[in-house]
């Protein structure tokens, strides 16, 4: 979960988010090296009086600044493509949950269970209890089993929405008339907060998402009480 004045990412709680954090560090290091090289060259230009006014052709230099950027782009593209394929890969999910976006709340349907559906609204500020998080608490949490692949089917009944949970590396658009999917695997139990990440109207800021990841036994007990 995020905290005040946070500058970095939230702690990763899924394999996908772990990969995204590694890719971020990898790319940031490349950007740092390029920036350092550019600043070094600029400092040399400003502090020395060496000039090459008579130079008309420099094949070696042109070759270097053509090949080197191509290599850098390959070093960025390959791990990026790998993560994209990992995010799209779904192998025999144990549970499927259908998520529908509305103005301005979410509804959930556990397709593996009969009549296990509910709406999830934000709890107003005046109704919060001590310890609750303002603008992020909901009346019905999405309870899911941890360490088990879960397929999320995401769509919308009105306008564009986006179902996003940062600590799990999830952000999938909810588009009317189209069903998108995402894979969710949590490596630890806990509460994970998210929000609608697509401007969808006047109450866009009041569409929080709360996932409660629990051991499988607790999930089975929860489904029994809900049915």
From Swiss-Prot:
Cofactor: how and how many bound: Binds a dinuclear copper A center per subunit.
Membrane topology: Multi-pass membrane protein
Topological domains, Mitochondrial matrix: 46-59
Residues holding Cu cation A2: 196, 198, 200, 204
EC number of this enzyme: 7.1.1.9
Catalytic activities: 4 Fe(II)-[cytochrome c] + O2 + 8 H(+)(in) = 4 Fe(III)-[cytochrome c] + 2 H2O + 4 H(+)(out)
Top-level enzyme category: translocase
Ranges that cross the membrane: 15-45, 60-87
Residue sites binding Cu cation A1 per the record: 161, 196, 200, 207
GO molecular function, one term: copper ion binding
Compartmental location: Mitochondrion inner membrane
InterPro entries xref list: CcO_II (IPR045187), CcO_II-like_C (IPR002429), CcO_II_C (IPR034210), Copper_CuA (IPR001505), Cupredoxin (IPR008972), Cyt_c_oxidase_su2 (IPR014222), Cyt_c_oxidase_su2_TM_dom (IPR011759), Cyt_c_oxidase_su2_TM_sf (IPR036257)
Key words, A-Z: Copper, Electron transport, Magnesium, Membrane, Metal-binding, Mitochondrion, Mitochondrion inner membrane, Respiratory chain, Translocase, Transmembrane, Transmembrane helix, Transport
Gene Ontology CC annotations of this record: mitochondrial inner membrane; respiratory chain complex IV
UniProt topological domain (Mitochondrial intermembrane) ranges: 1-14, 88-227
Binding site for Mg(2+): 198
GO BP terms, alphabetized: ATP synthesis coupled electron transport
Subunit structure: Component of the cytochrome c oxidase (complex IV, CIV), a multisubunit enzyme composed of 14 subunits. The complex is composed of a catalytic core of 3 subunits MT-CO1, MT-CO2 and MT-CO3, encoded in the mitochondrial DNA, and 11 supernumerary subunits COX4I, COX5A, COX5B, COX6A, COX6B, COX6C, COX7A, COX7B, COX7C, COX8 and NDUFA4, which are encoded in the nuclear genome.
Protein name per the record: Cytochrome c oxidase subunit 2
Species of the source: Tupaia glis (Common tree shrew)
